[in-house]
């Protein structure tokens, strides 16, 4: 249910302990200009035809209660809610599939006929009380194939006696609450025939642009103790615009960028103050259509194909370890910066800071807010005119106006406020701005000014009818398929000619399994009785309940994943379920196959700018209906030709419509300036502490080995800086006989001594670069400098990189002690085991955050390598990478000789870091079906506007999360879609757009919502929310909220869905692992209490949670345990002519360990091999290379390569695990009864420790809270 803009609904609470929640964001997006029209007032949804809506989907069940007021609960327990249609509706309903070709009918042809989609006043919003609104999302996944999850058989061995796991009163003090790249080279220039090539380069450098939904964020009421899901605000000197009236505030919400707030007695006001910061980027246009299949070994094979006219290029790229990269293009003073729509802020929030970052929202920010954006009324209209001047499909025509901001490049507007239709003639494009007079990008843009929205013309205005002569090759109508657009009567006389995805709607009824009592995911599980809850095989992502053909077309969960694979119809239904709603994304991951499309035309919706995808509906050959805003768009002439089949007139068979993940080679329309070269700057700590650690030797050797593998082209540039108490620059200009060191000792006023010779061409100055790398490790051997001027060194790096942008790699070994950004030690070693307050999780100064935002504005990302044995205040230093879209690498107790395992890890990590794909000047936007909105983002980036994430760099190891809310009822549609678009510049200088599209069903039954829970995605989203809560509130609040997430969801299930005995702790099969994963999260370094944890270690764990993809994060939260002393070939898999054993998973409990065995624990970044005291000597000799248990050394970090079957199996299995992750894990071999085993046993999360519950005790605690 949606509430009127600006209205507030205080959330009711079921218990006093904190709940997860988030500031919801509502509103529509900004208009794109007169060239786009509003959505049709008719049945919404890609699959919605004039069909009877089955029970369970689309319509409320007769017992379904949709309260019109606020949802509240009693103070002591969960309110018993009426039972929805339960499991029967999960399979009994028909999901109407998006129709690629729908035969129109004559509905609503009479004058004055009522439109099916007239929007009445929104119903009041229902705010959940216990968990709060789990509104958010992120997507990231770990498996290349979306296969249906197989029901795992649980070995039900009931506990003989609860006394074995009795929870004593002493546990109350344990921290738990006692109460609750390819180039499409055509053989001829501007050839009319596309060339088909099959190069072997991996599909690297494919980062695209991702843009969030156009809905304006509205802050929802949250409890004092709920996860607010806010983003950090940053202050700026200039004041915010005055608060508009409530009426104007509602009007502004339609623009998609106004900030709405709520207030509730006793609750602090909260806001999502989303600000824009415009910078530029550019792409190389490729007008020569080609089809390329790239692979990393073979050369291109050109093959001419003869189409009737010039056509787009589609290429499938096989990605390998190293992909093609490309240069990025930051803004320059010669290129304009696009204005943005305004952000309106209420007066009560004027004390908040004005910059949002996708990780933390800090409501205690300074009281001088200033949005980082520059806009005016005139500029906003100019932006709208620019978008209106672009056709429904972006083309490379020189008549297109030159966009002057990323927001204008990608486009972002919702159909409600658009004034003209897709088929009406586009207005003349706005004159191209003069680059010479364009303003330079500013790091701190001017305040935003409210802009009144424009009136929209009626939907369908100006659409011409279909030409009567277009009836060739008519096909018989498909029975049962009704038109999805009854308003358009102009082409109703023409039959359907081409089948498509939409035709599947007539067969979706086959999904009904009414003969089955319930799906496996809804099978009730008694958690306290079912002891072996963990399956023996890995947990796969659940497959959405869609037609088989739609499942094949859907996006891989490795790239795009939702916490709920069945989307609730209303926010009230989501509140009842007490589950988080959000997306997890891994948008730039390495792909083995990626369709790369080079075309003069990138087909996009004129209203919401969605890229055409497999879930759109083709009304006829000339029109397609957007699956996000339901706007009808024209099909461009070029799109009629399919280069793969060499056929004409079948747009629904184009690769863009057959693949949910595609990459476009973008035209000049997506550029703000020419692509810049790839620029790499290394800033190195050379103080005494750094020289003593010995990292310079490893770094310089790795650079020498991988210098030729750095992503880039012939223009690639590189530079070096070192620092201690002074800053050292290195002149590597071609022509010098040796490198020249230039020392700047005035760290209070840093300047560049020779700006033109500090960043040099990699290939022209390669010999000088090699000389420097060979000399650096020994240059500072006898240094006595103990101080570190990191802040001034970063200021100098910013000045050096500003003209082009690029990547700065910073290596730091101690606490900064001189100049700007100096820090003091804040850690008290005596408080590392505290069960009470954990302090200093946030930064001590805003210096690094402000500098990071300046870097982001100049398209520069900062990656931090922290190699320190002492406290270095990572909480403060990490801001440099968080807000500039960089990465953080942490090597505690690093020493070249004393800690060889860390030294080896650094060497392997550097090889991956230096050679992996990279994208420059990236922006990312996520769009979603109308009615859904995004309100909180998690990851390393800067939020430039309400839905546009600025990524100075993008890499294949970065993950993101987004929280979602349901702003409007989804009763008019049976499917919802999400689309992420990542626009970036490859290291080869190509502008590319990688697009992922995910389709999910909508359900109206609470049982169906539970049936579609993706428990791993949910726990990863909760982990991101808990990090925010730890920083903005306290660690104890975050822990309480995690516990309440379990209590509330299981309580809601028991009171609304489950009909079994209420004395037992019941959960649906889809949620049976939820309590286990939450307990594992509570025992993770980021959130554990009562166990000695260094502050930097805790902060680094939180940074990993916020930036890792789901597949790697889950291993960090819940490690995998295998027995490896009995490996066999049974069930083994074959990988590259290698047989890899697949041992079953073991529960993380000491009861599974035997002294006669050996066990491998995979914790993501570290492997442990625990060897029992009575382990078979044959295994010890054949695998470890020692005669018996006693002869195994205390510190062993390698498995020897022995010519035995057992050794081959063990090494093959460990190598297979290592190959599945980007960074190399450290291997520790731990002997039973050795001191090192304590670290291993800390990961046995099902066992009790001095400061935490066992799994069974935790279940009893949850059950006790539910029964209160």
UniProtKB/Swiss-Prot annotation:
The modification N-acetylserine is found at residue 2. Residues 225-234 have a biased composition (Polar residues). Belongs to the SEC23/SEC24 family. SEC24 subfamily. Residues 376-389 have a biased composition (Acidic residues). Residues 605-629 are annotated as: Zinc finger-like. This is Protein transport protein Sec24B. The keyword ATP-binding does not apply. Residues 1-14, 21-48, 245-255, 311-332, 365-375 have a biased composition (Low complexity). Residues 426-450 have a biased composition (Pro residues). It is a peripheral membrane protein. One of its GO terms (biological process) is intracellular protein transport. The modification Phosphothreonine is found at residue 329. It comes from Homo sapiens. It is found in: Cytoplasmic vesicle, COPII-coated vesicle membrane; Endoplasmic reticulum membrane; Cytoplasm, Cytosol. Keywords: Acetylation, Cytoplasm, Cytoplasmic vesicle, Endoplasmic reticulum, ER-Golgi transport, Membrane, Metal-binding, Phosphoprotein, Protein transport, Transport, Zinc. Zn(2+) binds at residues 605, 608, 626, 629. The modification Phosphoserine is found at residue 1224. Gelsolin-like repeats lie at residues 1141-1213. COPII is composed of at least five proteins: the Sec23/24 complex, the Sec13/31 complex and SAR1. Interacts with STING1; promoting STING1 translocation to COPII vesicles in a STEEP1-dependent manner. Interacts with RNF139. Interacts with TMED2 and TMED10. Interacts with CNIH4. GO terms for molecular function: SNARE binding; zinc ion binding. Residues 1-71, 216-263, 303-345, 362-451 are annotated as: Disordered.
């Amino acid at each position: 249910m949606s509430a009127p803009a600006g209205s507030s609904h205080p959330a009711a609470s079921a218990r006093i302990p904190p709940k997860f929640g988030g500031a919801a964001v509502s509103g529509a997006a900004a208009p794109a200009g007169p060239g786009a029209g509003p959505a049709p007032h008719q049945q919404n949804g890609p699959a919605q035809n004039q069909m009877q809506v089955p029970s369970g989907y689309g319509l409320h069940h007769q017992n379904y209660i949709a309260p019109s007021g606020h949802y509240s609960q009693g103070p002591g327990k969960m309110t018993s809610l009426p039972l929805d249609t339960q499991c029967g509706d999960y399979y009994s309903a028909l999901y109407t599939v998006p129709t690629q070709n729908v035969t129109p009918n004559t509905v609503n042809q009479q004058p004055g006929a009522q439109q099916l989609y007239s929007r009445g006043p929104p119903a009041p919003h229902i705010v959940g009380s216990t968990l709060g609104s789990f509104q958010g999302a992120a997507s990231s996944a770990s498996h290349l194939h979306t296969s249906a999850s197989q029901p795992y058989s649980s070995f039900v061995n009931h506990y003989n006696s609860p006394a074995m796991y009795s929870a004593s009163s002493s546990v109350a003090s344990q921290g738990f609450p006692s109460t609750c790249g390819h180039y499409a080279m055509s053989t001829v220039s501007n050839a009319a025939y596309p060339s088909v090539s099959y190069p072997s380069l991996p599909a690297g450098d494919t980062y695209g642009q991702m843009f969030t939904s156009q809905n304006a964020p509205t802050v929802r009421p949250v409890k004092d103790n709920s996860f607010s899901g806010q983003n950090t605000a940053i202050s700026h000197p200039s004041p915010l615009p005055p608060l508009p009236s409530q009426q104007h505030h509602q009007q502004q919400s339609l623009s998609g960028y106004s900030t709405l707030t709520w207030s509730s007695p006793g609750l602090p006001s909260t806001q999502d103050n989303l600000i824009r910061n415009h910078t530029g980027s550019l792409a190389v246009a490729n007008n020569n259509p080609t089809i390329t299949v790239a692979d990393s070994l073979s050369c291109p094979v050109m093959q001419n194909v003869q189409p009737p006219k010039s056509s787009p290029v589609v290429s499938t790229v096989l990605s390998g370890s190293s992909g093609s990269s490309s240069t990025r293009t930051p803004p320059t003073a010669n290129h304009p910066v696009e204005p943005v729509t305004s952000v309106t802020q209420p007066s009560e929030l004027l004390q908040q800071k004005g910059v949002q970052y996708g990780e933390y929202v800090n409501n205690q920010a300074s009281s001088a807010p200033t949005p980082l954006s520059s806009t005016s009324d005139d500029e906003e209209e100019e932006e709208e005119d620019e978008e209106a001047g672009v056709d429904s499909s972006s083309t490379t025509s020189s008549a297109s106006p030159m966009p002057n901001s990323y927001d204008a490049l990608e486009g972002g507007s919702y159909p409600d406020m658009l004034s003209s239709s897709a088929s009406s003639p586009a207005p003349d494009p706005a004159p191209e701005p003069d680059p010479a007079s364009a303003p330079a990008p500013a790091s701190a843009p001017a305040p935003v000014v409210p802009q009144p929205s424009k009136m929209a013309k009626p939907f369908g205005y100006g659409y011409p009818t279909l030409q009567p002569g277009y009836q060739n090759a008519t096909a018989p109508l498909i029975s049962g398929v009704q038109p999805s657009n009854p308003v358009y009567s102009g082409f109703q006389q023409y039959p359907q000619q081409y089948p498509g995805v939409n035709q599947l709607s007539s067969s979706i009824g086959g999904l009904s399994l009414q003969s089955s009592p319930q799906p496996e995911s809804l099978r009730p599980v008694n958690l306290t009785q079912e002891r072996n809850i963990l399956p023996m095989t890995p947990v796969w992502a659940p497959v959405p309940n869609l037609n088989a053909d739609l499942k094949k077309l859907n996006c891989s969960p490795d790239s795009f994943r939702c916490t709920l694979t069945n989307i609730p119809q209303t926010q009230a239904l989501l509140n009842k379920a007490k589950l988080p709603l959000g997306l997890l994304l891994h948008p730039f991951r390495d792909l083995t196959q990626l369709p790369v499309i080079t075309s003069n035309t990138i087909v996009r919706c004129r209203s919401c700018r969605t890229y055409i995808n497999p879930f759109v509906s083709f009304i006829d050959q000339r029109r397609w209906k957007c699956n996000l805003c339901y706007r009808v768009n024209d099909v461009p002439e070029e799109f009629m030709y399919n280069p793969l089949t060499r056929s004409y007139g079948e747009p629904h068979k184009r690769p863009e419509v057959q693949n949910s993940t595609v990459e476009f080679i973008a035209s000049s329309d997506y550029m703000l300036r020419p692509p810049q070269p790839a620029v790499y700057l290394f800033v190195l700590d050379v103080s005494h502490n750094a020289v003593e650690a010995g990292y310079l030797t490893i770094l310089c050797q790795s650079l020498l080995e991988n210098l030729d593998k750095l992503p880039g082209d012939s223009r690639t540039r590189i530079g070096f800086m070192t620092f201690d108490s002074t800053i050292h620059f290195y002149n590597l200009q071609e022509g010098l006989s040796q490198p020249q060191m230039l020392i700047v000792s005035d760290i209070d006023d840093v300047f560049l001594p020779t700006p033109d010779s500090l960043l040099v061409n990699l290939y022209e100055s390669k010999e000088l670069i090699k000389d420097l790398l060979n000399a650096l490790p020994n240059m500072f051997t006898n240094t006595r400098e103990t101080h570190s001027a990191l802040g001034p060194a970063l200021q100098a790096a910013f000045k050096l990189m500003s003209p082009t942008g690029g990547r700065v790699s910073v290596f730091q070994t101690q606490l900064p002690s001189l100049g700007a950004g100096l820090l003091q030690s804040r850690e008290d070693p005596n408080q590392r085991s505290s069960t009470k307050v954990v302090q200093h999780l946030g930064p001590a100064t805003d210096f690094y955050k402000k500098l990071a935002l300046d870097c982001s504005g100049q398209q520069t990302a900062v990656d931090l390598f922290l190699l320190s044995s002492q406290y270095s205040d990572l909480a403060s230093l990490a801001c440099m990478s968080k807000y500039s879209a960089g990465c953080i690498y942490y090597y505690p107790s690093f020493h070249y000789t004393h800690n060889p395992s860390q030294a080896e890890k650094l060497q392997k990590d550097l090889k991956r870091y230096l050679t992996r794909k990279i994208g420059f000047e990236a922006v990312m936007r996520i769009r979603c079906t109308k009615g859904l909105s995004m309100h909180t983002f998690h990851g390393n980036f800067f939020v430039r506007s309400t839905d546009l994430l600025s990524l100075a760099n993008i890499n294949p190891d970065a993950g993101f999360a987004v929280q979602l809310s349901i702003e409007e009822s989804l009763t008019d549609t049976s499917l919802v879609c999400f689309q992420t678009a990542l626009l970036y510049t490859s290291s080869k200088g190509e502008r590319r757009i990688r697009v992922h599209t995910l389709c999910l069903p909508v359900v109206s039954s609470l049982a169906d919502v539970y049936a579609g829970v993706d428990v791993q995605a949910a726990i990863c989203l909760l982990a991101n929310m808990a990090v925010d809560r730890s920083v903005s509130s306290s660690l104890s609040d975050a822990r309480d909220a995690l516990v309440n997430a379990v209590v509330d969801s299981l309580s809601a299930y028991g009171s609304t869905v489950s009909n079994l005995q209420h004395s037992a702790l019941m959960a649906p099969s889809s949620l049976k692992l939820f309590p286990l994963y939450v307990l594992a999260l509570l025992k993770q370094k980021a959130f554990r209490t009562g166990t000695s944890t260094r502050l930097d270690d805790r902060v680094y764990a939180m940074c990993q949670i916020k930036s890792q993809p789901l597949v790697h994060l889950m291993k960090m939260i819940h490690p995998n345990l295998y027995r490896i002393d009995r490996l066999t070939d049974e069930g083994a898999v074959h990988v590259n002519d290698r047989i890899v054993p697949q041992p079953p998973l073991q529960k993380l409990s000491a009861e599974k360990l035997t002294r006669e065995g050996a066990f491998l624990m995979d914790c993501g970044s570290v492997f442990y091999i625990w060897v029992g005291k009575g382990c078979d000597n044959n295994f010890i000799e054949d695998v470890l290379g020692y005669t018996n248990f006693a002869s195994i050394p205390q510190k062993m970090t390698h498995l020897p390569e022995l010519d035995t079957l057992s050794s081959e199996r063990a090494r093959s299995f460990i190598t297979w695990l290592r190959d599945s992750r980007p960074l190399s894990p450290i291997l520790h071999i731990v002997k039973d009864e050795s001191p090192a085993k304590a670290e291993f046993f800390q990961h046995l999360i099902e066992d009790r420790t001095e400061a935490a519950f066992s799994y069974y005790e935790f279940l009893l605690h949850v059950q006790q809270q539910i029964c209160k």
